[in-house]
Design a protein with these regions (language model features):
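PLP-dependent enzyme catalytic core of the Aspartate aminotransferase-like
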Residues: 51, 117-118, 133-195
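Active-site C-terminal subdomain of aminotransferase-like
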Residues: 3-100, 104-116, 121-132
């Protein structure tokens, strides 16, 4: 107790001045955005609900389209009535379940790689949540260092493709994916002819 009293008596007013100066400078100059950053932040927040509606709508349409295709073995998207998570999704996310979905492409690793490589609108990235549509084939990219057995243990199958559906026109996205499926089919057929 004595040391604290001596310190405050010795520093006293000077310490108060340092605290006041620091608080005042922080208030006057401190951690604030630049005008451009603040404008961008406001614009982003004001349009967020519209963008999310478009993400969800596009993802739902793409999932339904994929689910109807013969070259797709399965689609994992909680917004589909066939999904085991459909009831929970409707209960917890009644306005839509998001824009990320996965599907199992028939034809394996080579078909998955061919599909991703041939896409023009979808960017080949491991991210999610961008305004642009993104695609990745985990077996040939993010999980390629694992053995096939280890990949299966982590849930990565040879034909697994993950999409993060963006804001583009959904007809353009379907056309891009259709071209990707054609490339995957060509690789699969070439492999069958070779064997």
């Amino acid at each position: 107790m004595y040391k604290r009293q001596v310190y405050s008596e010795a520093v006293g007013d000077a310490l108060a001045y340092v605290v006041k100066a620091r608080v005042q400078l922080l208030r006057d100059l401190g951690a604030s955005n630049s005008a451009d950053s603040a404008f961008s932040l406001i614009q982003g927040i004001e349009t967020l609900s519209l963008r999310l509606e478009r993400h969800v709508q596009n993802a739902q349409e793409i999932a339904e389209w994929l689910d109807a295709r013969d070259d797709v073995a399965a689609v994992w998207y909680a917004g589909l009535p066939t999904s085991p998570w459909y009831a929970a999704a409707n209960r917890y996310a009644p306005r839509g379940v998001g824009a990320v979905l996965s599907f199992e492409l028939k034809g394996g690793v080579d078909a998955g790689r061919a599909l991703v490589d041939s896409l023009q609108l979808f960017s080949h990235l491991a991210n999610i949540g961008d305004v642009r549509s993104l695609v990745i084939h985990p077996a040939s990219t993010t999980h390629s260092q694992l053995t096939p057995e280890e990949q299966l243990t982590t849930g990565v199958t040879p034909g697994l493709v993950r999409l993060s559906v963006g804001l583009e026109n959904v007809d353009d996205l379907r056309s891009d994916l259709a071209a990707g499926f054609a490339a995957a089919r060509a690789v699969t057929e070439a492999g069958l002819r070779a064997s």
